[in-house]
Every structure is written in structure tokens, then in C-alpha cells.
């Protein structure tokens, strides 16, 4: 006789039946991501993305940084569901039109549109905009010298994009380390992962309005490298009448993904206040020191954090769709 004993009224077969019924319900809304998701349904997916990003990056070298930033802003609000791509219409102000997102580069939106157009000709109605943004980001990061990381696919595009939800979910340039980490933490990221992802500022640029308060008046930051501060003051002197004026986040190697961002922080060359505080705060300084001296450690941590970022809040079939156009929901009344 078996040694297994069951209490009175306990029927294991009923439990097994319940699990069999409930399991599909539990998993139905969860996207199952895998790297070969489009192998059969859109076999040219990787080729089409790679060719499009190569052409665009050659034409406009800031595309990589812009797309990386767009991906981050997408994933940190409502998850990686392409909600940041939705255009505002007469009955909804979308995420991309919130003040915190108004400087998201047009080239980043453009590359997603280019890829979507090509994919719709090759395999219509198959590839989500969320997957396009994720894959394009990885390919562009590696193109400019950054680390390779796996991109698992199978995300669906979300049904919601609300501008009023942006604030409090995307870090701001003047926030403290605890404030910024609070945003990262609720998305499952540690302090070390936060610093690693901040290293994305090794490429790209920021507009003067995002750091001008560090340059002028009684609140001017005395810890900025004096020569750097003087150059920024000259660059931004007309920023109130021309809000397109911008400076490179990494003044030394702005187009190369490397660990120079962290080296710059130690020299007083951090552009944003939120950059500079990483070297000032005792909780984040050890990671800045590590990455400044060990690019391999930075690349490894960044790659792992990016793989993790790509899984934040992904949508399954019930909670998402494959949009026909990345800037509109399929149901325009949503």
C-alpha cells in the first residue's frame, strides 16, 4: 500500500482537475516571450529590422540614443507595450505629449515607423510595435559599440496611453537618488541596476532647459567643472528663445557607447543634476567608481538590466493587440 495518506474529504483528483482548468486562465494574459517568436510567422523579421536601423543610424547618428531613450520611457509606464508611440487625438492626450516626453527625438519614432512599414509588407499583422521598439533598441545599441543582449519577443501592443500618468513614473533631471530609485524599484530594479541603466547617457543629448538651472544665478552648481560650465553657458545663452538647443550627455565620446559617462562624473562633467548626484550619493558612488574603471562590469550589468527592462509589464493576447499602425490603436475609440 502506498505511504501517501489523505485527510478525510480530500480528493487529489479534484485538485488536479481544478489545476488543469485554472492554469490556462492564469497564463492567458501573460505574454510568453522567446527569442525565436517570429521564426515561422515572420522569418525575415531580424533582417528587416537590422537593415532599417543600419540605414537610419548612418543617416542620423543620434538615432541610437533616441531609440534607447524611447524604449526606456515606454517600459517604465504601463510596461513595454508601445504606449509611448500612440498619437494624441481629439479625445485623448497621449503619453508622448506630456511635458516630460516632449523632447523624445523624432528620429526614434521614425525608425519604428520605417520598420513597421517594411514588416507589414513582408508579414502583415504579425509583428507588434512593442517588439519592433525592443529589437531596434538592441540592434542600435550594439551598432554604436554597446553590449549585446538577448531580446525575447512576443509582446503585444497596449490599449492605453495617458499623458497624465507620465509624471511620477519617469525620472526627472532634478530628482534625488531616493526619488529616482523609487521609480526604478517599483519596476523591480535594484540600485546597482539603476546606475547601470543610467549609463545609457553615454550617448545622446539633453536640451538646455533640462540643466540650465545648474548654470545660472544663485543656484548655479559650483561642482561642475569650470571649463565645462563656461562652455555650457555659452551654448545655452539663448535657450529661452530656442528650446531646441542641446548638449551631448557625454562630452568626450558622444557617439560611442562606452564607460566614459562614469569617468566624466568623476571629473565634474555630468550634464544633468540627476547624473551628478550619482557620484555624490554614498549609495550610488561605489557603482560609478566600479563602472568608471571597469567597462566590462558596466557592459555586463547593463546587458542584464536591459534584458530585464524588456520584460517589464509586457502584455499578452487579452491585454494587447498587434497594431496596424504604431501611432494608433486598432480600435480608434479606445
Curated annotation (Swiss-Prot):
Substrate binds at residue 171. Keywords: Calcium, Disulfide bond, Glycoprotein, Heme, Hydrogen peroxide, Iron, Metal-binding, Oxidoreductase, Peroxidase, Secreted, Signal. It comes from the Eukaryota. Glycans are attached at residues 174, 238, 282, 294. The keyword Glycoprotein applies. Ca(2+) 2 binds at residues 202, 250, 253, 258. PANTHER family: PEROXIDASE 65 (PTHR31517:SF42), PTHR31517. This is Peroxidase 65. It comes from Arabidopsis thaliana (Mouse-ear cress). The gene is PER65.
Amino acid at each position: 500500500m502506498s505511504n501517501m495518506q489523505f485527510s478525510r474529504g480530500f480528493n487529489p483528483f479534484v485538485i488536479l482537475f481544478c489545476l488543469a482548468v485554472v492554469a490556462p486562465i492564469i497564463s492567458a494574459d501573460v505574454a510568453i516571450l522567446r527569442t525565436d517568436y517570429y521564426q515561422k510567422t515572420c522569418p525575415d523579421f531580424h533582417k528587416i529590422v537590422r537593415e532599417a536601423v543600419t540605414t537610419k543610424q548612418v543617416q542620423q547618428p543620434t538615432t541610437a540614443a533616441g531609440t534607447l531613450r524611447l524604449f526606456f520611457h515606454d517600459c517604465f509606464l504601463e510596461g513595454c507595450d508601445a504606449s509611448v508611440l500612440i498619437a494624441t487625438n481629439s479625445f485623448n492626450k497621449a503619453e508622448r505629449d506630456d511635458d516630460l516626453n516632449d523632447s523624445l527625438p523624432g528620429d526614434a519614432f521614425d525608425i519604428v515607423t520605417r520598420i513597421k512599414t517594411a514588416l507589414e509588407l513582408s508579414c502583415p499583422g504579425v509583428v507588434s510595435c512593442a517588439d519592433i521598439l525592443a529589437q531596434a533598441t538592441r540592434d542600435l545599441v550594439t551598432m554604436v559599440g554597446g553590449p549585446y543582449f538577448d531580446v525575447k519577443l512576443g509582446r503585444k501592443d497596449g490599449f492605453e496611453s495617458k499623458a497624465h500618468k507620465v509624471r511620477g513614473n519617469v525620472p526627472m533631471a532634478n530628482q534625488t537618488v531616493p526619488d529616482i530609485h523609487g521609480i526604478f524599484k517599483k519596476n523591480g530594479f535594484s540600485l546597482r541596476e539603476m546606475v547601470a541603466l543610467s549609463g545609457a547617457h553615454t550617448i545622446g543629448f539633453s536640451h538646455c532647459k533640462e540643466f540650465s538651472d545648474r548654470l545660472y544665478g544663485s543656484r548655479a552648481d559650483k561642482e561642475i567643472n569650470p571649463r565645462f560650465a563656461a562652455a555650457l553657458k555659452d551654448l545655452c545663452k539663448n535657450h529661452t528663445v530656442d528650446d531646441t538647443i542641446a548638449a551631448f550627455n557625454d562630452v568626450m565620446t558622444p557617439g560611442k557607447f562606452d564607460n566614459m559617462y562614469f569617468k566624466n562624473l568623476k571629473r565634474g562633467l555630468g550634464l544633468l543634476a540627476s547624473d551628478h548626484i550619482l557620484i555624490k550619493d554614498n549609495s550610488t558612488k561605489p557603482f560609478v567608481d566600479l563602472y568608471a574603471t571597469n567597462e566590462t562590469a558596466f557592459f555586463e550589468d547593463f546587458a542584464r538590466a536591459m534584458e530585464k527592462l524588456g520584460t517589464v509589464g509586457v502584455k499578452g493576447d487579452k491585454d494587447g493587440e498587434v497594431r496596424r499602425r504604431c501611432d494608433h490603436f486598432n480600435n480608434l475609440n479606445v
